[in-house]
């Protein structure tokens, strides 16, 4: 007969059986391997030898070093002026007033004063350009005027920049990007001549500009077409007489400068310009007060009997 098992041993055997039935968990041991890297260099902090810029400049002078001062100002280039120094006022009627009248005497006196001021400006221009001759300038100005306007026909803006100033360029090329310009010079009705010469400085006394106003009475043709080829302004085969007062400018202190067209003076007594033709609407039939549009359109479509 078997001997009875004590109660304590039965509980122990039961616990060991449950523990052996559990799945075995395999664990991996983590190994830390040190990696040798490049040692970083941290520069030491040194105290500045010179606390102020003045001490540094004094030490540099003692050592024989000349340090140029740093300029924080930005340089700008002024190739032209933004307007006219002393705008020439064309006399009303283009100086056709009799010199014996009161108005004629006043006009003649003012003209003499302006002539004296022009002579002073001519001498100042010759100080910078010894080859300048006022008698040869009107012909040169006419060539610049013609070539500048011909550049608009083929949209040669690179050449136009050399013939007109930066002030005049936007005025000539404004609103013609998608348009066709047909301009031509026919003839000169009167010889061009200089009516006023002025010189002035800008920003400082060393930046001198010269402006010459030339009177031109010519015959020209002008026609402007829109991007669809429809005529907007003028006619190519109808020449017109044009009286213009053109201002030419040059930066006298620039040894490579040249005379360029700057602006035009429009007198207040000049006739108004021809308005631009609007081609966006087709005009309909003229209606009477008692008619309607449909009735007038039906009558226009009726065949006419012989």
Curated annotation (Swiss-Prot):
GO terms of biological process kind: mitochondrial translation
Disulphide bonds in the chain: none
Gene3D superfamilies in the cross-refs: 3.10.450.240
Keywords: Mitochondrion, Ribonucleoprotein, Ribosomal protein, Transit peptide
Main location: mitochondrion
Chain residue ranges for the region called Disordered: 287-306
Subunit field text: Component of the mitochondrial large ribosomal subunit (mt-LSU). Mature mammalian 55S mitochondrial ribosomes consist of a small (28S) and a large (39S) subunit. The 28S small subunit contains a 12S ribosomal RNA (12S mt-rRNA) and 30 different proteins. The 39S large subunit contains a 16S rRNA (16S mt-rRNA), a copy of mitochondrial valine transfer RNA (mt-tRNA(Val)), which plays an integral structural role, and 52 different proteins.
Protein role: Component of the mitochondrial large ribosomal subunit (mt-LSU). Within the mitochondrial ribosomes, required to direct the nascent polypeptide toward the tunnel exit and position the exit at a distance from the membrane surface.
Record protein name field: Large ribosomal subunit protein mL45
Organism whose genome encodes this protein: Homo sapiens (Human)
Protein encoded by which gene: MRPL45
